[in-house]
Amino acid sequence: MQTINSKSLLRCAVAGLTIVAASAVSFGQNYRNSDDAFLPSPVRSASTVPSNGDVNPYGVAFIKNNFLTGSGLLKHGDILVSNFNNAQNLQGTGTTIVRIPQSGSPSLFFHGNAPLGLSTGLGTLQYGFVLVANLPTADGTSGTAQAGSLLVINNQGQLIQTITSPQIDGPWDMTVVDEGNRASVFFSNALNGTVSRINFSVSPAGLRELSHYTIASGYLHQGDPAALFDAPTGLVFDQNTNRLYVASTLDNAVFIVRDAKSRTTSDGPGDVVYQDNAHLHGALAMAEAPNGHLLVTNNDVINSDPNQPSEIVEFTKWGQFVKEIPVDPNQGGSFGLAVHKVSDDTSILAAVDDNTASITIWTLPLN
């Protein structure tokens, strides 16, 4: 157990949390990287509230090095955050995506026209497109939720396509498999408790749907005044095994759907890989760490525990708990997160805090 893969990504994050105060300007100006340094890199926090006042940050995505930035607003290493609520804090009414640069102040990347509710489903394609799932409501309640759509935004921050499909029914989260001229997008649907896959061809002109399938179904789902929906949410696709990991909030468990990229029929909910009432409190958004572990946030509505607020839980793909850390001292803060491997030695973990409408960014050594 001496390899990098056996170590906890969150171990370094916990250490980083203890020196948040040290990331003030005076420290940052004097900080120098060193291979034998003990102290982790400073923890950074940024507001996700744009000028129109949108709140409740949900989706998180990195602009990777293969993204075609062109002359657009985005730069490699930027972080994007989608907002689900408007300035009146009505769920399913947020219309903005905020850009968090590697240095400098956040700025507005995209402002769409209502009705929109930009959910946790946020991703990118190397052609220079940003994809965001849209689950709008009329008044912030689940009773007025609509089927929604997938928005395709170019690197200039301009909406170029709005895609609807029978396989998009309240898109609560998604994950994107980017293969250049082709892409597969997996959606978790809050309105019917299913997971679907839409295959696209991709060109500079945009996306064209090739086929669509429901590949998993039967997840518990319900409307919830606090969270809008308790439903299947976080998705992680494992290219090596062709398996899709699904975090289902109301089931409070993580499932495996086998043959996810090739199957054309539903596998039911798949098989439970991780169910842990001691650490899971409404399994929500999910990301994969560079060590192969999975990271899942919790909505704190299901199996609530005030002594474990706003946790990110790290566990192995065979269902063994590793570690947990909070993103907020109060319940209800954790939601979207993403991990970006910068180099063989360094990764970045970014996680939103819905309570404070902010994002926390950790730079973590992998060795």
Report each predicted region and the residues it spans:
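Bacterial N-terminal signal peptides that target proteins for export
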Residues: Q2-V14
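A short loop-to-beta-strand structural motif that recurs across blades of beta-propeller domains
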Residues: G94-V98, G148-L151, G193-S196, N252-I256, ...
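Bacterial N-terminal signal peptides
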Residues: A13-S23
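Short loop/turn segments immediately following the C-termini of beta-strands
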Residues: F84-N86, N134-T137, A145, N155, ...
